[in-house]
Amino acid sequence: MIVQNIEITTLSNGVRVVSETVPYVQSVSVGLWVGVGSRDETDPVRGITHFIEHMLFKGTPTRSARTIAEEIESRGGMLNAFTDKEYTCYYAKALSEHVEIVMDVLTDMLAHSLLDPEEIAREKNVVLEEIKRYKDQPEDTVHDIFAQTLWKNHPLGRPIIGTSHTVSSLTREHIEEYMQTHYTPDKIVVSVAGNVTHAEVVELANRFLGSISGPPYKRRARKPQPSGNSKTVRRRTEQVHFCLGGQGFSQKDDDRWVLTIIDSVLGGNMSSRLFQEIREKRGLAYAIGSYAVSYTEGGIFAVHGGTSPQTFSQVLELTTKELENVRKNNLTEDEVMKSKTQVRGALVLSLENMSSRMMRMGRSMIHFGRVIPLEDILQKINAVTHDDIDRVANQLFDGSTLTLAAIGPLEKDAI
């Protein structure tokens, strides 16, 4: 039995506080989660969620940008943030004795950022350089091209970073209006894991966030529909980078755990079928693997890799062959058992890291409004059967519905 001391409190203004007390460690990981991501953006302000994440590090009435970093780092801690398609997270890790200053700094950033026009102009240049750097990395951009092609015209298909045009056009008024709409108490989750009590966390959250206000915001639900299209981007690179896949499952669909097992067998690790066949046995690629991602209303499954233009067709053929093999239910009992053990082990091992515990709770609160017990997840993984795998593989791996995205020195009709 895995014992987790998780408690949840909702403040009077709607801010949710979740904590896990782990008395045998000396650290604490704190995350401020906001239930807003790139999927919530309109076309004219694409990239604004990510841009706001940058701006919240640029100073408050009582702290400069440098002071924000120094107050955490001078105590041996670390401070960072990330933007996803459905949420944004500002987080820090430090010794548990510094939990008060960590909460003070993070909440000050969230609630009192200056959004100085000069800083906005300067940070635009930073993000524009980030976009250029990103475009120079085809092994990364191919994933966005894949999502855009798979989910054409759906906000989940948009790149998180935005475009050079939309980022250049952002104004302080855009940012303030967006934050007033989305950075509301009902969308905020304070997630804390480490050597700290729930009462301490609630007191700090009340002190620093208890007075913020704003009307609740309800995201418009719209399930993404797969296009079945493919796309080639011609570029003078040494390799062809590709993603082949399609629709996965939402966060609330238990078939996501069936797909997790399939993913592990196909390309989730070094002992997977694709890694062994394409890299180890044939030496056709350095990077080859697969992934499954779940969102509120849908999900993605994809095989990704990079190979020379001359061997791209062969790698693609081997990949589709393995997908078809899984459709024909040729996974062995041993493969399924090992995959279940691997997935369960990775989940349990993640509990040794306070940041992983904090992130698991934060994501669960954003998606479900509660923390799904780890025992429940482990039971769902154990319950996956060969019939489940056969059913899901037949549903997802139909070659006529798959989407392929590729970047490299290819002709337009290469796929």
Where do the language-model regions lie?
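Catalytic cores of enzymes that engage adenine nucleotides and/or redox cofactors via long glycine-rich
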Residues: P224-S227, E277
